[in-house]
Amino acid sequence: MKSDYINRDVMGHILFALNPVNRLVCKVALETGLRIGDILEFKTFDIVFKKSFTIREQKTGKSRKITLREPLRKELQDISGTYYVFEHRTDPHKHRARQTVYTDIKRVCKLFKVKENISPHSIRKLYAVDMYKKTGDMSKVQKALLHDNELTTMLYALSDILHSKKR
């Protein structure tokens, strides 16, 4: 089942109720548009010692340069583990699992009786919608999401409209 779009107000309520570390993962996703799996692989060294760093996306294998706003970078530094920013609960040599973030989001959605199918990927759609509204330029959104196909980008950037028509 595909993840649904969710507006910023509802997302704000969901973020508020998440576990603090999972909330921070989602805040990074809202700022960067990255997939959760890519965020969970952030290395402590990169966050502490670099203003910008490059990641290789798991799904596409494409490289992307990341620059975080200083307040968010500081939050990440404060929770950083020995090797990964988002350390695994029992093994510091592993990062937190994607399933952990997913399960927490599902828990909160159930608590708030959210009918839409919200998942971490819904945040990527919200990022695309916000960027498209801000810039009005589909090619900028496509570049930010590293999509090869503009039609794929349109599904993300216009997901608010598609969601409202579905209702």
Which residues does each predicted region cover?
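Short amphipathic helical patch at the helix-1/turn junction of helix-turn-helix
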Residues: 29-31, 132-133, 157
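C-terminal catalytic core of Y-nucleophile DNA break-rejoin enzymes
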Residues: 58-77, 83-106
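Active-site His/Glu-centered metal-binding helix of metallohydrolases
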Residues: 123, 127
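Active-site-proximal segment of tyrosine recombinases
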Residues: 38-39, 117-118, 128, 136-147
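Basic, Lys/Arg- and aromatic-enriched nucleic-acid-binding interface segment
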Residues: 4-32, 36
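Short, polar N-cap/turn motifs at the start of nucleic acid-interacting alpha helices
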Residues: 47-50, 137-157, 161-162
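Conserved tyrosine-mediated DNA breakage-rejoining catalytic core shared by Y-recombinases
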Residues: 5-8, 32, 41-74
